[in-house]
From Swiss-Prot:
The protein's name: Large ribosomal subunit protein uL16
GO biological process: translation
Organism of this sequence: Novosphingobium aromaticivorans (strain ATCC 700278 / DSM 12444 / CCUG 56034 / CIP 105152 / NBRC 16084 / F199)
Gene3D superfamilies, alphabetized: Ribosomal protein L10e/L16
HAMAP family: Ribosomal_uL16
Description of how the protein assembles with itself and partners: Part of the 50S ribosomal subunit.
Function: Binds 23S rRNA and is also seen to make contacts with the A and possibly P site tRNAs.
Amino acid sequence: MLQPKKTKFRKAFKGRIHGLAKGGTDLNFGSYGLKALEPERVTARQIEAARRAITRHIRRQGRLWIRVFPDVPVSKKPAEVRQGKGKGSIEYWAARVKPGRILFELDGVPGPLAAEAFSRAAMKLPIKTKVVARLGDTSHLAGE
């Protein structure tokens, strides 16, 4: 699973996710992409589950890019532990995703296959998403 090798600080504030994504909103690598429509923290496990769903569906053809990285440590106290005594230990890593952010990109696969792969990946994610394509390409809409 994805996680940073080294961080400046061990633990992070919870924070809030405001506004729209400033960067990472356009397709840079592939012909098709999966774009986030809601703000949410996406965990490393969810990213990995979505990646597996895509790669299993496209069956080793084409190329996949993961455009988000889980760089935020999420801490949690154990069950039935009294409050106080410091912040809990790190439970998992997450990526803060804003609306408009491209999560995954695909290239070298037909449009309907990419759309189906992304719809399977979207089921593994806690946010609403949509499939986007390069300007003028509507072949991913053929299956609808």
